């Protein structure tokens, strides 16, 4: 299991700052939102959405179930404001909160989250807490990312450390649980994994896209900032993982269903 400590204040700040650019760059996350919608088992009357972001999934939910009572939660106030703009005067309850700290009193037919649980400090405990808030026949449904996400970046970085003869526990980017580890977080969990690939003109463009969605380092740990290592990493990445002049970046998309 990947152990991590998320800097929640830093994460909140970065996602708020990127609320205006998120939708232009979150292509994979949008695909995942549509995939989640297809996995809803029963039409819900009460919905809790965790990590609503700019409201992309929120709008899909509201359009599909306009009579449902929908509560949307996000840790970043900037994201909440953007979501409110997207949904207009839709009767949605908005809550700016950290779901790991929030006390939940209501029961829900559907608890749903898109591309958020990878940022939880204690995902197993949070999943258990949320699963208890389901109504009878209720569903906890979420998408997240697995350990093979950005494997090209991690492979190239490991190569750069090796040729620089650096034997230190340095890393680049976040580390996520495996598909099996996500499934093991709840005894009723069922799941599916798939891979999505995006292409960029350069590694710098790839990094820029991550910055625009706020998905930069918010975890504690030792991150390498040596220019020589980054230069070697970028060279290896562009030599090894290029196709027709574009570098590729793989997303390991995981869908978990608890019913």
Curated annotation (Swiss-Prot):
Enumerate the Gene3D superfamilies for this protein.
Vaccinia Virus protein VP39 (3.40.50.150)
Instruction: Return the InterPro entries for the record.
Output: BioC, Methyltransf_25, SAM-dependent_MTases_sf
Look up the signal peptide feature and give its range: none
Q: Report which reactions are catalysed by this protein.
A: malonyl-[ACP] + S-adenosyl-L-methionine = malonyl-[ACP] methyl ester + S-adenosyl-L-homocysteine
Top EC category: transferase
Q: Matching SUPFAM superfamilies, A to Z? A: S-adenosyl-L-methionine-dependent methyltransferases
Functional pathway: Cofactor biosynthesis; biotin biosynthesis
Q: One Pfam family from the UniProt entry?
A: Methyltransf_25
Q: Tell me, what is an example of a GO biological process annotation in this record?
A: biotin biosynthetic process
Q: What Enzyme Commission number(s) does the record list for this chain? A: 2.1.1.197
Annotated GO MF terms? carboxyl-O-methyltransferase activity; malonyl-CoA methyltransferase activity
Look up the coiled coil feature and give its residue ranges: none
User: Of which family is this protein a member?
Assistant: Belongs to the methyltransferase superfamily.
PANTHER family tied to this protein: TRANS-ACONITATE 2-METHYLTRANSFERASE, TRANS-ACONITATE 2-METHYLTRANSFERASE-RELATED
Q: What does this protein do?
A: Converts the free carboxyl group of a malonyl-thioester to its methyl ester by transfer of a methyl group from S-adenosyl-L-methionine (SAM). It allows to synthesize pimeloyl-ACP via the fatty acid synthetic pathway.
Protein's recorded name: Malonyl-[acyl-carrier protein] O-methyltransferase
Instruction: Name its species.
Output: Anoxybacillus flavithermus (strain DSM 21510 / WK1)
The encoding gene: bioC
């Amino acid at each position: 299991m990947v152990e991590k400590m998320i800097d929640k204040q830093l994460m909140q700040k970065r996602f708020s700052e990127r609320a205006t650019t998120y939708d232009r760059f979150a292509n994979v996350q949008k695909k995942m939102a549509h995939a989640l919608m297809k996995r809803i088992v029963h039409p819900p009357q009460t919905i809790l959405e965790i990590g609503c972001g700019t409201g992309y999934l929120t709008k899909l939910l509201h359009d599909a179930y306009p009579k449902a009572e929908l509560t949307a939660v996000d840790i970043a106030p900037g994201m909440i404001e953007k979501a409110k703009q997207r949904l207009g005067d839709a009767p949605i309850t908005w809550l700016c909160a950290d779901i790991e700290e929030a006390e939940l009193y209501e029961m829900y037919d559907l608890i749903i989250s898109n591309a958020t649980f990878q940022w939880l400090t204690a995902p197993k405990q949070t999943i258990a807490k949320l699963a208890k808030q389901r109504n009878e026949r209720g569903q906890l449904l979420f998408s997240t990312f697995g350990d093979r996400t950005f494997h090209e970046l991690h492979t190239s970085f490991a190569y750069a450390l090796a040729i620089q003869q650096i034997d230190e526990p340095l890393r680049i980017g976040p580390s996520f649980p495996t598909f099996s580890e996500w499934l093991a977080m709840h005894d009723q969990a069922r799941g599916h994994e798939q891979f999505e690939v995006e292409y960029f003109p350069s590694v710098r463009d790839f990094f820029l896209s991550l910055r625009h969605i706020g998905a930069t380092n918010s975890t504690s740990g030792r991150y390498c900032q040596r220019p020589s290592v980054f230069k070697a990493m970028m060279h290896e990445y562009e030599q090894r993982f290029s196709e027709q002049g574009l570098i590729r970046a793989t997303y390991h998309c995981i869908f978990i269903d608890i019913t």
